[in-house]
Every structure is written in structure tokens, then in C-alpha cells.
Amino acid sequence: MGKCRGLRTARKLRNHRREQKWHDKQYKKAHLGTALKANPFGSASHAKGIVLEKVGVEAKQPNSAIRKCVRVQLIKNGKKITAFVPNDGCLNFXEENDEVLVAGFGRKXHAVGDIPGVRFKVVEMANVSLLALYKGXKERPKS
């Protein structure tokens, strides 16, 4: 059938375009507001939380590894998330009930690489940058 092409078809074209927009995945996600509700951070880039436990997440095939992660309960809304702890041996800096700063992990609302279901990474532990702890530039404060 094709689209209307004649004179006085602007209203029909405009209405059709308005309806068809909702079949576009990105448009729907941006305009319904449900993606924002589902995001544990809300509209923020980082969030603070309390470490509940240390967990090992098995990497997806064909890799064989246990990725070191922590379960974190966010302070602002009480939601529980799993966050990846980057760098070698950095899991040793963390203990349960520590306060951590968590950021996104690259792809918006998607898991990264071979770590299934993990969408966040730890940036700070006990108000000290994880990178500074790893490089030995700073030490973990005594609690």
C-alpha cells in the first residue's frame, strides 16, 4: 500500500510517525521511564553501598575463571546488586560491612565480557580509591 504522498497528507503522515515511534526499542526505553525505575542507581553515575558478602562468579564459556565480586546493598534505596572488584588481589582490601562506591561497568545496563549478570564495578573501598590501594599509594584506614 505504501505511504501517503499527496497534498494535504501531513496530518496522516505525522500521526503515523507518532504511532510508529513506539515500535523503536531505544525510543520506547527513553520515553516510558521504566528503564530509569529499573536502574538501581536511579539517574546517578555512582552510588554508595554496604558490602554484604564476597562472591565468586564463574566466567562464561570458553573462559574458565572465578571472577571476584561483592554483593552490595545500596544506601539510597536498599537495592542489592553484584559489583565486580577489578585488579589482582583487590578483594583482600574489602571486608563485610565496608562502605564502597560503585560505578557502572562499561555497557549501559548490560553485563561486560565474560561475567554474567554483573553490571557494576567497585571504585572506592572505605573512602579510599581502589586504584590507590592497589598501587600502594594509600593504605586502608583502620576501623
Curated annotation (Swiss-Prot):
<dbReference type="InterPro" id="IPR005680">
    <property type="entry name" value="Ribosomal_uS12_euk/arc"/>
</dbReference>
<comment type="similarity">
    <text>Belongs to the universal ribosomal protein uS12 family.</text>
</comment>
<dbReference type="InterPro" id="IPR006032">
    <property type="entry name" value="Ribosomal_uS12"/>
</dbReference>
<dbReference type="GO" id="GO:0022627">
    <property type="term" value="C:cytosolic small ribosomal subunit"/>
</dbReference>
<comment type="subunit">
    <text>Component of the 40S small ribosomal subunit.</text>
</comment>
<keyword id="KW-0963">Cytoplasm</keyword>
<dbReference type="GO" id="GO:0005791">
    <property type="term" value="C:rough endoplasmic reticulum"/>
</dbReference>
<dbReference type="Pfam" id="PF00164">
    <property type="entry name" value="Ribosom_S12_S23"/>
</dbReference>
<dbReference type="InterPro" id="IPR012340">
    <property type="entry name" value="NA-bd_OB-fold"/>
</dbReference>
<keyword id="KW-0687">Ribonucleoprotein</keyword>
<keyword id="KW-0256">Endoplasmic reticulum</keyword>
<dbReference type="GO" id="GO:0003735">
    <property type="term" value="F:structural constituent of ribosome"/>
</dbReference>
<dbReference type="GO" id="GO:0002181">
    <property type="term" value="P:cytoplasmic translation"/>
</dbReference>
<protein>
    <recommendedName>
        <fullName>Small ribosomal subunit protein uS12</fullName>
    </recommendedName>
</protein>
<keyword id="KW-0689">Ribosomal protein</keyword>
